[in-house]
UniProtKB/Swiss-Prot annotation:
This is Large ribosomal subunit protein eL32. The keyword Ribonucleoprotein applies. The keyword Ribonucleoprotein applies. Keywords: Ribonucleoprotein, Ribosomal protein. One of its GO terms (molecular function) is structural constituent of ribosome. GO terms for biological process: translation. HAMAP family: Ribosomal_eL32 (MF_00810). NCBIfam families: PRK08562.1. Signal peptide: none annotated. Belongs to the eukaryotic ribosomal protein eL32 family. One of its GO terms (cellular component) is cytosolic large ribosomal subunit. CDD domains: Ribosomal_L32_L32e.
């Protein structure tokens, strides 16, 4: 088993054990979102790290450095806006994610070109890719 595969498996296990970092009192008030904010209150149980409160973000929860930030498939996630940017990708180490601002017509062109070059597109389902390729 290669070191890379071992680290990817370790990353997955660590992710499963990692707690969900939520903003303090986000379950009590609808106006407060769940996105993490560091608690700053003087008597805040979460800030003091009382056992029964939610866990705060700590450096020990990070994943292995070599595979940090990679897609679960092990490929580097690159945002693509046009076909030119797609040509610059390496299909063995990088995958494409089509930017949200890209319209349907250009999205179809990108998916077709990615299929020709053998590049994986992360945010287009296999079913949708089949529809795009048949057009």
């Amino acid at each position: 088993m290669s070191e890379f595969k071992r680290l990817m498996r370790l990353k997955l296990k660590m992710k499963q054990k990692r707690p969900e970092f939520k903003r303090q009192d986000s379950h009590r008030f609808q106006r407060i979102g769940t996105m993490w904010r560091r608690p700053t209150g003087h008597h805040s149980g979460q800030r003091i790290q009382v056992t029964y409160r939610l866990s705060p973000v700590k450096i020990g929860f990070r994943g292995p450095a070599l595979v940090r930030g990679l897609h679960p498939s092990g490929l580097e996630d690159i945002i693509v806006n046009n076909v030119k940017q797609l040509a610059a990708l390496n299909p063995k180490t990088q995958g494409a994610r089509i930017a949200s601002a890209v319209g349907t017509r250009k999205r179809i062109e990108i998916v077709k070109k990615a299929n020709e070059l053998g590049i994986r597109v992360f945010n287009v389902s296999k079913q949708k890719q089949g529809e795009f390729l048949s057009l």
